[in-house]
Amino acid sequence: MEAKQSYSRRFFLKTSSVASAFAFIPRKAKALYDDLKQFIIPPKEVMPLTVTINKKEYKINADSRTTLLDLLREDLHLTGTKKGCDHGQCGACTVHVDGKRVLSCLTLAAMLPGKNVTTIEGLSDGDKLHPMQEAFITCDGFQCGYCTPGQIMSAVACVNEGHIHSVAEIKEFMSGNLCRCGAYNGIVESIQKVAK
């Protein structure tokens, strides 16, 4: 004969109060979120922007907090510039603004009117690759290719700014661009080839 399982009044009260609390929490949390949403998520401040990217002028409306990286990838669909760390530590998002390299994840789009932005898509001349792009192919300056656009943009700046007198100087200039695959020797060789 099977023993009948009995539940005490105390067990019933504990179980039902925990269950009712879980039923109440989501509604209360949503109500609290709705009350605080205006303080947590500030409204977008859309502003008109006229920016020149790869020698082409764009007129767009963008949130004043939009980074250059997000403007390029999300709004203009120029996806050659990569989002790596989104904290300015890996160099995958490197582009040129008025000929100087910048990390597009740390640059606000609102700072760009009147400036010229060049991305990896703007380096080539039609179907003719930039000499640095050709050198990266010839010297195996990439492996998986994810960091390559940022590496090439920094490498072009390295040559243009004259940081090519020694391997140590090239490595120092390029130290802000990380390559998880370890193609650093090919990258340095590519820069030296273009610098000749």
Task: Specify the residue positions occupied by each region the protein language model found.
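N-terminal secretory signal peptides and thylakoid transit peptides that target proteins
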Residues: 1-20
